[in-house]
Amino acid sequence: MSYSKKDDDGDESIFANVNQVTVTQDARAFNSSSISPRKSRRLLSKIAYLIYTGEHFQEKQATELFFGITKLFQHKDPSLRQFVYIIIKELSVVAEDVIMITSSIMKDTATGRETIYRPNAIRSLIRVIDANTVPAIERILTTGIVDPISAVASAALVSAYHLYPVAKDIVSRWNNEVQDAVTSHNVGRKVASSPFFTSTLGYTPNASGISQYHALGLLYRIRRHDSIAMNKLLQLLVSNLGTVSNSHAFVMLIRYISSLMDQNTQFRDQMVPFLHGWLKSKGDMVNLEVARNMVRLKNISDDDLQPVVSVLKIFLSSHRSATRFSAIRTLNELAMTRPHLVHSCNLNIESLITDVNRSIATYAITTLLKTGNDESVDRLMKQIVTFMSDISDNFKIIVVDAIRSLCLKFPRKQDSMLTFLSNILCDEGGYEFKRAAVDAISDMIKYIPESKERALAELCEFIEDCEYPKIAVRILSILGEEGPKASEPTRFIRYIYNRIMLENAIVRSAAVSALTKFGLNAEDKFVQRSVKVILTRCLEDADDEVRDRAAFSVKALEDRDAFLPVVKSDKIPSLPALERSLVIYISERKFGQGFDIKSVPVLSQEEIDAENLRIKKATTEVEFTEVTPAEDQNALASSNIETEFLNALESVSEFNEYGPVLKSSPSPIELTEQETEFVVKVVKHVFKDHLVVQFQLHNTLSEVILENAVVVSTPSTDDLVEECVVPAAIVSGEPVSIFVSFKFNDSVPYPLTTLTNTLQFTTKEIDIHTGEPEEEGYEDEYKIDDLDVSAGDFISPAYESNFDGLFDSLEHEASEVYVLSLLDSFRSTCSRVAELLQMQPLEGTENPTDKPVHVMKLSGKLVNGEKVLALVKMAHSKDGEGITIKVIARGESDSSVELVVGGIA
């Protein structure tokens, strides 16, 4: 064939004029007595083109096509048969009565059929059956799962995976066959001889063993809710490493091991040596996967991570870009939580700043920013400027996020960082990039008071030429909040006024709201009058939203004393609690009485700022970080914990008279191991005069139920007096709550004690034939771990912008010295003390330097609203064992400071 330019001009795509009408008409050829495989494949490719480009076939039309295509089963051409199965799978979603071709497909699943037919037939078979007909194909799939031919075994395993949601019990019965597919050296290791390979493909493919990967995925799905069975499987595979030969399966095995290591401390200790061994073998893909998963383990020691850092350091000099990228990205992730471990790699990382791959260079810079110190910041900032124009917006956002974190870590370097952020606002970039820069400047304004004046001025300059209305609205909101607090608030009014004159209605509305805050918060009468004049002019605006806001604002300025408490309220309802209360109010449908907003817990601005600061310091590049299924489930479960426990608490009428919940535990505390028959978690709820301990009990035994389950909780001191116990009537498979309420001793406002806990219940066995519990049961008890009531239960983190000034102004002071013998570094001491006291570290003091003495600043608010601050001075003990700390607390009362200094013991 000639491939001249003339031929190219006359060549037209077969998809040029394809539509549903012509395809449906042409499909009548499938009913003819003589079928041309070539023409049929051409027509099937047109149908596939329509489906994959989003064309939707009507049910009747799809059914006609579906049964027309089934006529092609009479032709034995392997390529045509493969295409038939592809289209059958796609049309089976829309067409009617697809189950009628089950027998035709099942013929191709027989072991004696052409090898090319069987995998495709198995995949198509599960698309045309329903849950009721799964038993009819059970033998086909179980035979396929243990088939020695790789394509057949993979097809059967993937099909079983898709069947699991609709036939969970049946697929679970195939547990032994699936485990054989993982551990056997015969299953899925061959490629059958077929004329199709030599005549059509021209070669015979190799057996990749990919069926082992599919089998491991299916086995995990079957066993994932049985941690004991999963533990045994993983230990079996680890002890016989030769069993897992496929690299993809090995990577999946590592991920499953990591997810279980986070849940089981004993299992983690057993697996760490194996992971260290795999760091030096099995190929780069496995090495990097081990490193990434070890970095993400929550409770792993620094010593266990040292081999990981050493291996990643070697990979940084690899000649393969993908390997260097994976290594630097993993180190970047480690630097977010343990920057001190990455210091040894800094020289290697600096060499990557000039890497031709700008993605690698970006991660190198951001990693160095996270591990840098005061001396290296300025040098790194100069290097960043040189390549910012060469990278995409996505990576620019990563750099900006790293700069933002660095601002919070080294507030003294705010001048150079603010200059950098201001310059990139003037550069070309998309909305997300500019928004990230504005958010970074906003954080500097909020958490670094020294930068406020200049940062606000930079935002005012940017807003003059801002092309994104959403960003303009964001900046106006910042100006409205922070501008009135500046030393010269009037300098910002001109920029806001320009927005009213020049921008669209959305921005004008935001400008009106910002001006209103200036008028309400300004003490200068001239400023109030000027703002009122501008707002009065807005009453004639063409947009009704602007007019409405202006009318409200003018009224607020005229009656300033009445509106000021509303506008300047520093108490904000807890949004999760507000949402939960509104849902309950709507579901009860008692609209005769109004919604009681006073029942919703409120948060102060300091508490909100402290939580926001904690989140920002813990932020990772979510867009570029993959999350394993186990991590994703854990995150989802964690987000629902507060609602789950508080809903159960609100359902108990005995606690209604206690008043609002002042504080709850930030996360459930486990009082038993995850693998025990009775799993108990606990959350502490603090009220004004009461402590309610909520025990969540999960009975994992399917053959017994528990009745009248209670927890006998005994305080170690007289500071708590038990008031009532709310038992769980029946405990079967679902978690239930047991409550124990204590009243505070009048003489001790903040009781610190230890609760000794014993679970008591009546056990009744389940009749295996009827599924009903036996009438007779027996009394039993189960010992669970003790629970400490500590200082952190009465303190919430609270952000304070002027720590030194407030510390000097507070009158009540107490101090105490402790030796923490189990800790060996300032970093671990900072983390432990902040966790015990539940106070907010300030000014980056939670990141110690290499100096021999370190001071950490902490801020918090007690449940009664009192502010309390603490200085924690620390030094290495003279004998070299542990860290010596001195806690100096200042607060609004003696009881508050005594609580803080006594909270470390």
Swiss-Prot record:
Membrane topology: Peripheral membrane protein
Record keyword Protein transport present: yes
Keywords, alphabetical: Cytoplasm, Cytoplasmic vesicle, ER-Golgi transport, Golgi apparatus, Membrane, Phosphoprotein, Protein transport, Repeat, Transport
Subcellular location: Cytoplasm; Golgi apparatus membrane; Cytoplasmic vesicle, COPI-coated vesicle membrane
GO molecular function annotation: structural molecule activity
Record InterPro entries: ARM-like, ARM-type_fold, Clathrin/coatomer_adapt-like_N, Clathrin_app_Ig-like_sf, Coatomer/calthrin_app_sub_C, Coatomer_g_Cpla, Coatomer_gsu, Coatomer_gsu_app_Ig-like_dom
Pfam families: Adaptin_N, Coatomer_g_Cpla, COP-gamma_platf
Residue stretches of each HEAT repeat: 265-302, 303-340, 374-412, 414-450, 525-563
GO cellular component terms, A-Z: COPI vesicle coat; cytosol; endoplasmic reticulum; endoplasmic reticulum-Golgi intermediate compartment; Golgi membrane
Phosphoserine carried by residues: 604
Superkingdom, natural source: Eukaryota
Record's function text: The coatomer is a cytosolic protein complex that binds to dilysine motifs and reversibly associates with Golgi non-clathrin-coated vesicles, which further mediate biosynthetic protein transport from the ER, via the Golgi up to the trans Golgi network. Coatomer complex is required for budding from Golgi membranes, and is essential for the retrograde Golgi-to-ER transport of dilysine-tagged proteins.
Subunit organization: Oligomeric complex that consists of at least the alpha, beta, beta', gamma, delta, epsilon and zeta subunits.
Family recorded in the similarity comment: Belongs to the COPG family.
Protein name as annotated: Probable coatomer subunit gamma
Organism for this UniProt entry: Schizosaccharomyces pombe (strain 972 / ATCC 24843)
Gene for this chain: sec21
